[in-house]
Every structure is written in structure tokens, then in C-alpha cells.
């Protein structure tokens, strides 16, 4: 796993020998932060590549293929999302997409690793001014602890974390889901990325099962994401009486999205028979 100097390539190896790779021009930056190994590459055809502990986090060209489905389905399904919490997302892409919604009055982003924010600010323009937006509040802290201790309440909670293995497993635990449920306002929505159903099957099913113990409804959908082992999975938790299968198309028109199509929101729930049967057994 990692950078191959002879091939001028970065390859991320997933379980069972599945790999996703990019030809790279150069390594722009690397460091060991307090929490993880951070690398940044310039690829031949996809812009900059952000890597944390050997795992691809962001591909600059096409990053909307991840950030749009993570943010807009829940934001458009909620009738009036005013207060939003983002856990993770240090590159700023999720914050950027959240702040495109005019209903948002406050968006709090909690990122544990300040170096991810700084490298993203210096080398990339993914945030596109989101960090400076007066509605945004950046907190450098552990998202698990923040959620446990905060008195704030939110309409939408978005978890933009690393894969559901290793240290990030805490973000996929029943206890974490319960804290999130408690910090949602009545009729709130929660979403997390959840890895590849084909390569992180057990981890995803565990999260789906534990969310089902906590939230009033749980929805699964997947989306092709550039740079990830697609299709990539997302899990949505509903608190109260919100129909996640219906989105506000009038608000959606103002966004001019590139990847996620609100007019075909219902297609998110069309999944392969294999996946549907897996979820039905949970």
C-alpha cells in the first residue's frame, strides 16, 4: 500500500487484493501528524490526492462525487436545516456543500487533526471560502468527545470520517449513534459514509444493525465515488417524522449540482439484489 517510486504511482490496496491507484507527478507534502500519516500528491490527471495513513481521502478532480451525495440528500430531505454538525471533513468540501444551503444559520465542523485543515488550505481550494464563512465554526477536537459533551442541538449531523476500521470504528458504534440521536432536534437527520459494501461488508452491516437499534428509520444508499472502491456506501438515520425518500426540488434547483441529481433521488434506493438481501437479514 502506498507510493511506488519506480512506477510513479500511488496505490491503495483494499481487502481481498482489490486496488485503486493513480499515476503521480510528485509528492507535494508528507508528515506524521499527532494522529496519522498525511501525504499529498499531484496526480497526472486528477489534481491533488490527499492520503491519510495510506488511505485515499480525497481526489481533487471529482471530489464532488463524494461530497454531494454525503450532504445534499439529507439537507434537501430536511424541511428547514438551520443548524448542522459536521464531524471530520478537514478538507472543507463537506462544509462547502452544507453552506450552499441558504437555510443554514450555523455549521459547526469538528476535526481532530488541525494539520489536515492547514494542508488543505495551503495546497488545495476544496473549501472555496467555506472556512471563512461567518456561519461556519471550526473546532479542533475529538468528534466523539464533542458529541458526548456538547449541549448544542442540530437539525442535521454529517459524519465525514475515514473508513469504518481502526480508530474510526468509534464513529460507527452504537454508543456514538445514541449520542448523535440525542443531539438531533426532533425531526432530524444523520448521515455517515460507510465504506464499500463489497469490501467492508461486516463493518457496514454492524453499523446498519446498530443504527437500527437507535434511529426511528435507517436507509442505505450507494454512489460511485472517484478514487474509492465504488460503489461507496452511505447510511442515513432518521429521528422523528421525516420522509427521507422525498426532497425539496425547489431548493435543489438553486444548487446546480454536478453529480447527485435530486430529481432522481428515488434511484438512490435501487440496489443490487445481493445488497438488498444482506440488509434484509440484519
From Swiss-Prot:
Subcellular location: Cytoplasm
Catalytic activity: S-adenosyl 3-(methylsulfanyl)propylamine + putrescine = S-methyl-5'-thioadenosine + spermidine + H(+)
Domain PABS, residue spans: 11-239
SUPFAM superfamilies according to UniProt: S-adenosyl-L-methionine-dependent methyltransferases
GO cellular component: cytoplasm
Alphabetized GO MF terms: spermidine synthase activity
Pfam families: Spermine_synt_N, Spermine_synth
UniProt keyword annotations, A-Z: Cytoplasm, Polyamine biosynthesis, Spermidine biosynthesis, Transferase
Annotated metabolic or biological route of this protein: Amine and polyamine biosynthesis; spermidine biosynthesis; spermidine from putrescine: step 1/1
Positions of the catalytic residues: 160 (proton acceptor)
EC identifiers of the protein: 2.5.1.16
Residues binding S-methyl-5'-thioadenosine: 36, 111, 142-143, 167
One biological process term in Gene Ontology: spermidine biosynthetic process
Binding site for spermidine: 67, 91, 160-163
InterPro entries for this protein: PABS, PABS_CS, SAM-dependent_MTases_sf, Spermi_synthase, Spermidine_synt_N, Spermidine_synt_N_sf
Primary localization: cytoplasm
Disulphide linkage map: none
Domain of life from the UniProt record: Archaea
Subunit (UniProt): Homodimer or homotetramer.
Family, similarity comment: Belongs to the spermidine/spermine synthase family.
Function: Catalyzes the irreversible transfer of a propylamine group from the amino donor S-adenosylmethioninamine (decarboxy-AdoMet) to putrescine (1,4-diaminobutane) to yield spermidine.
Protein name: Polyamine aminopropyltransferase
Amino acid at each position: 500500500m502506498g507510493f511506488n517510486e519506480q512506477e510513479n504511482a500511488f496505490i491503495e490496496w483494499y481487502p481481498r487484493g482489490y486496488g485503486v491507484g493513480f499515476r503521480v507527478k510528485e509528492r507535494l507534502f508528507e508528515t506524521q501528524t499527532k494522529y496519522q500519516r498525511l501525504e499529498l500528491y499531484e496526480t497526472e490527471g486528477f489534481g491533488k490526492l490527499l492520503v491519510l495513513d495510506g488511505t485515499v481521502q480525497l481526489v481533487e478532480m471529482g471530489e464532488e462525487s463524494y461530497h454531494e451525495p454525503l450532504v445534499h440528500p439529507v439537507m434537501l430531505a430536511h424541511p428547514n436545516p438551520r443548524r448542522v454538525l459536521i464531524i471530520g471533513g478537514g478538507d472543507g468540501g463537506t462544509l462547502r456543500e452544507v453552506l450552499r444551503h441558504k437555510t443554514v444559520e450555523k455549521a459547526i465542523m469538528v476535526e481532530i487533526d488541525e494539520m489536515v485543515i492547514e494542508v488543505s488550505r495551503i495546497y488545495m481550494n476544496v473549501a472555496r471560502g467555506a472556512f471563512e464563512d461567518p456561519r461556519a465554526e471550526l473546532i479542533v477536537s475529538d468528534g466523539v468527545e464533542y458529541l458526548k459533551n456538547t449541549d448544542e442541538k442540530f437539525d442535521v449531523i454529517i459524519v465525514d470520517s475515514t473508513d469504518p476500521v481502526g480508530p474510526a470504528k468509534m464513529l460507527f458504534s452504537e454508543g456514538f449513534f445514541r449520542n448523535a440521536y440525542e443531539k438531533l432536534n426532533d425531526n432530524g437527520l444523520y448521515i455517515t459514509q460507510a465504506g464499500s459494501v463489497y469490501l467492508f461488508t461486516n463493518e457496514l452491516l454492524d453499523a446498519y444493525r446498530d443504527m437500527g437499534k437507535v434511529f426511528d428509520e435507517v436507509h442505505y444508499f450507494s454512489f460511485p465515488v472517484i478514487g474509492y472502491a465504488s460503489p461507496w456506501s452511505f447510511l442515513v438515520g432518521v429521528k422523528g417524522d421525516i420522509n427521507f425518500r422525498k426532497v425539496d426540488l425547489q431548493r435543489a434547483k438553486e444548487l446546480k449540482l454536478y453529480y447527485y441529481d435530486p430529481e432522481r433521488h428515488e434511484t438512490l434506493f435501487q440496489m443490487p439484489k445481493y445488497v438488498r438481501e444482506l440488509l434484509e437479514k440484519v
